[in-house]
C-alpha cells in the first residue's frame, strides 16, 4: 500500500495539472479579465485571501490524522464515533449562532473568535482525556461553522457595501478561493505526512502546526482588516450618525428579529417550492454520506500501512480533478448540463460504495480496491459541489439563500450523526471493532442513500422538465468551479 499510495498521488497530481491547463485556456471569462485589470479590486481581493487561505490551510492540516490520533490514544472505534458525533452535533447547534454572531460582535471580531476557538481546539489534542477531546470537538464544530460563514460575510460586505465593486466580480474571488482550496488541501496532506511520519513527530504534529497558521490569520485580521474597517468608518457608512442615535438594546433586538425572520422565511421558501425541497433532500443525502466517509476511510486503509497524509492528498487531488472536469464539461466546446453532471456524480458515488461493500469483507480486505473506490468517490465530489451550487443559485432566491442552506444542513448533520451512532451501536454490540462487519454494513447503507439521492434528482428534473432555471444557457456561468 505504501507504493500504491505514492503512485496514485503522482498520477492524480499530473492529471490535475493537465486538466487545469486545458480548463484555463477554455474558460477565462470577460468578467474575470475585467476584474483582474482593476487594481483596487486586486488589492481588496489579496487582503481577503491572505487571511482566509491561512484559515483554510489550518483547517486542512487537521484532516489526515484526526482518526489516527484517537487510535494513537488507544480509544475504541465506538468511542471515536462518539467524538465525531459530538463534532457534527456542535455544527448543528452552532450553525444559527454562526449566522447571528457577526451581527452582534461584528464580522472582523467573529473571525478573531474563530482563530481563538480553533487554536484551543488544536491544543486539546495534546490531552488524552476523553472529555477534553469532546470539548475540542465541540470547539471544532463552532470553528467550522464560523469558517464557512463569517469570512465570506466580511468579504461580501466590503465588496458590495464599502468598495461598490460589481456583484458579478464576487464569483471571481470565490472561484479563486475554490482553486486555491484544493491546492491547499493537497499540500496540507503532504506537510502533515512529513511532520507526522517522515519526521516521526506523531499524529498530533499537524494539529500543533495549525496553530501558527491561525495566529498569522488573526494577525492579518487585526492589522490589515483593521485598516480596512477604519476606512469603512471614515468613508463607507453614511448611516452611522443615524445608527449611533439609537440605543444598543434596540439594535440588538433588531438583529435578533432579523435573524429569526430570516429563519422563518428560509423555512417557508423550503416548504413552498418543491424544487428547493428536492434539492435539499439531495444535499442532505449526499453530504451526510460524505461525513460518514470522512470517519471510515482511515480505519479501512490504516491497518495496511499506507502513509495517511499521501492518501489524503490523493483524495483531494481526485476532488480537484472532478472540479476541473466540471469546468471543462460546462464550457463552450461541450455545454453539458450541470444537472446531468450531478446525476453522474451520484452514480459514481453509488458505484464507489457498492465496491466498498465487497472490498471490506471481514477477513478478506482488499485495500487497493478500497483506495480506488475512495478516489472515485472524491472525483464524484468534485463534480457534485459545483453542480449543486449552480442549481442552488437558480432555484433558491438570493435574499433567502443563507437561511435555506442553513435548513439544508440540519438534516444533513442529523443523518450523519444517526449513521455514526448506528455504527457505534453495531461495533459495541458485536465487540468486533474494525474486524467486524459494521463498516461493510455502513457502506451498504451509504449506497442505499445514494440511490435515494438519485431518485430525488430524477424527481427534481421531472418537476422542472421545462424549467429554464435548471439549465445552463448561453456563455458559461461565471464562477462555476
Curated annotation (Swiss-Prot):
Q: Can you name this protein?
A: Molybdate-anion transporter
Localization per Swiss-Prot or TrEMBL: Cell membrane
Membrane topology, from the record: Multi-pass membrane protein
Its cellular-component GO annotations read: plasma membrane
> Which InterPro entries does its entry note?
MFS_trans_sf, MOT2/MFSD5
The protein's matches in CDD domains, at most eight in alphabetical order, are given as: MFS_MFSD5_like
Native source species = Danio rerio
UniProt GO BP: monoatomic ion transport
